[in-house]
């Protein structure tokens, strides 16, 4: 049958799937209640997606750091996702008109809008399947809020630290975040990429948008910017993935636990981009190797790639192909690990679940999905450690940030590097 790929919104031919809508539709209530009771205590979450800042009021009315400057902003940058069904159309339009992630050439704007309009109803159906919207904003707010509480204790010299969200394709958008920074009297801002592994199509696209909006608003010199541009080997991140895998392994009978194959699944990338030297592929490999080292290589593992779009070659092997081929060889027990994501969203809650249902229909009954790091305090502590090191090092970005891909011909890439070199 023809299935609509939920993550990249393209049609692809697959085997039939079972109806698991009700299970995913209960995701929000079940997951969030477990989080509040069992993992950590957090303040109540407001679903108002237009609010860009999370718990932004400085403690005890403080509006300046001990250095006499304004608060330090930590801006959580990500693709984002529609928080409700009404946001799906605008989300798709922003996505398909962005040449950094989906290049359509001369007809980028008109063709992108056309594609978005045609696909909106189908994509809305997929978001309905997971509860009516993406949980990515919810988890990003929790991560940012808890991280900044830790930063206030670790780095009193730059406190208070205020968490903000800047999504590329869904509210809260980059331009709204900049207005909120101004209102909060921010002096220094850290652009914290929520893509642990760098790709020009993800981290690069978000920073390109930040540059554009700073110029459009005439805010180039309003804030002192620095960038956490990649963190594939951050120990808190590695430990959080490992802990989630260990918890899932415990759900298997003890006598088969060591035989479970761990499948690290990341969003795929066109081979044309890989051939240019985009570092994403080897940074994904670095993360998965580090996780397996933390697990003492007790299980076999495979790197796989999901969400391919169109007929051109993309990174392989595809995640669903890996599941099927291993299953054909008698391997029934596998754990799918979304290794490139810091929170659950449509690609984990819908696409990976579809793969699991496909596998069950083929008799591959032991495939399970590991949750993203979401509200893991291990990961959040790691984020705080990372940003604290960044603040104390007083460097604008990593050494690798100014290294363009050997085959890069993108003007926006060169403009991004030149722009942030001035800070």
UniProtKB/Swiss-Prot annotation:
EC number annotated for this UniProt entry? 4.98.1.1
Where is this protein's transit peptide? 1-40
- Residue sites binding [2Fe-2S] cluster per the record: 200, 405, 408, 413
Keyword entries, A-Z: 2Fe-2S, Cytoplasm, Heme biosynthesis, Iron, Iron-sulfur, Lyase, Membrane, Metal-binding, Mitochondrion, Mitochondrion inner membrane, Nucleus, Porphyrin biosynthesis, Transit peptide
Annotated cofactor note: Binds 1 [2Fe-2S] cluster.
Q: Name one GO cellular component term.
A: cytosol
Note the InterPro entries from the entry. Ferrochelatase, Ferrochelatase_AS, Ferrochelatase_C, Ferrochelatase_N
The record's section on Gene3D superfamilies has: 3.40.50.1400
Primary localization: mitochondrion
State where the protein is found.
Answer: Mitochondrion inner membrane; Cytoplasm; Nucleus
One family from Pfam that matches here is Ferrochelatase
Q: Where is the active site?
A: 385
Pathway participation: Porphyrin-containing compound metabolism; protoheme biosynthesis; protoheme from protoporphyrin-IX: step 1/1
Q: Which GO terms describe its biological process?
A: heme biosynthetic process
Reaction(s) catalysed by this chain, per the record, are:
heme b + 2 H(+) = protoporphyrin IX + Fe(2+)
| MF terms (GO), sorted A to Z | 2 iron, 2 sulfur cluster binding; ferrochelatase activity; metal ion binding
Top class in the EC scheme: lyase
Task: State the needed cofactors, names only.
Answer: [2Fe-2S] cluster
Which family does the record claim for this protein?
A: Belongs to the ferrochelatase family.
Function description: Catalyzes the ferrous insertion into protoporphyrin IX.
Q: Please name the PANTHER family in this protein's record.
A: FERROCHELATASE, FERROCHELATASE, MITOCHONDRIAL
How this chain assembles, per its entry, is: Monomer.
Which protein is depicted? Ferrochelatase, mitochondrial
Q: Which organism does this sequence originate in?
A: Schizosaccharomyces pombe (strain 972 / ATCC 24843)
This protein's encoding gene = hem15
């Amino acid at each position: 049958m023809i299935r609509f790929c939920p993550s990249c919104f393209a049609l692809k031919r697959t085997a039939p799937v079972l109806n698991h809508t009700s299970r995913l539709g209960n995701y929000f209530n079940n997951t969030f209640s477990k989080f509040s009771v069992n993992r950590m205590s957090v303040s109540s979450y407001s679903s108002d997606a237009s609010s860009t800042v999370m718990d932004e009021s400085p403690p005890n009315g403080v509006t300046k750091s001990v250095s006499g400057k304004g608060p330090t902003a930590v801006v959580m940058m990500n693709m984002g996702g529609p928080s409700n069904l009404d946001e799906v159309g605008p989300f798709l339009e922003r996505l398909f008109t962005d040449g950094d992630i989906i290049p359509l050439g001369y007809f980028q704007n008109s063709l992108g809008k056309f594609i978005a309009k045609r696909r909106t109803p189908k994509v809305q159906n997929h978001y309905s399947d997971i509860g009516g919207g993406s949980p990515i904003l919810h988890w990003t707010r929790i991560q940012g809020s808890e991280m900044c509480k830790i930063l206030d204790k670790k780095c009193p010299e730059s406190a208070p630290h205020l968490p903000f969200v800047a999504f590329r394709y869904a509210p809260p958008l980059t331009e709204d975040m900049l207005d909120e920074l101004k209102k909060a009297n921010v002096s220094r801002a850290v652009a914290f990429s929520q893509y642990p592994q760098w790709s020009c199509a993800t981290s690069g696209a978000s920073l390109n948008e930040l540059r554009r909006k700073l110029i459009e608003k005439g805010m180039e010199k309003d804030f002192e910017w620095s960038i956490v541009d990649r963190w594939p080997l951050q120990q808190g991140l590695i430990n959080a993935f490992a802990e989630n895998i260990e918890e899932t392994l415990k759900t298997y009978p003890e006598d088969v636990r060591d035989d479970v194959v761990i499948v690290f699944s990341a969003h795929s990338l066109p081979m044309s981009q890989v051939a240019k030297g985009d570092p994403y592929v080897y940074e994904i490999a670095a993360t998965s190797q580090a996780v397996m080292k933390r697990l003492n290589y007790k299980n076999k593992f495979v790197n796989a790639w999901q969400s391919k779009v169109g007929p051109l070659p993309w990174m392989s092997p595809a995640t669903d192909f890996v599941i099927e081929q291993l299953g054909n060889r008698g391997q029934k027990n596998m754990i799918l690990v979304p290794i490139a994501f810091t929170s659950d969203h449509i690609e984990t809650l819908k696409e990976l679940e579809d793969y699991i249902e496909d596998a069950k229909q083929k008799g591959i009954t032991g495939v399970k999905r590991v949750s993203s790091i979401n509200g893991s305090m291990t990961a959040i502590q790691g984020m705080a450690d990372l940003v604290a090191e960044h603040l104390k090092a007083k460097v604008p970005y990593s050494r690798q940030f100014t290294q363009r891909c050997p085959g890069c011909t993108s003007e926006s890439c060169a403009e991004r590097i030149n722009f942030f070199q001035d800070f």
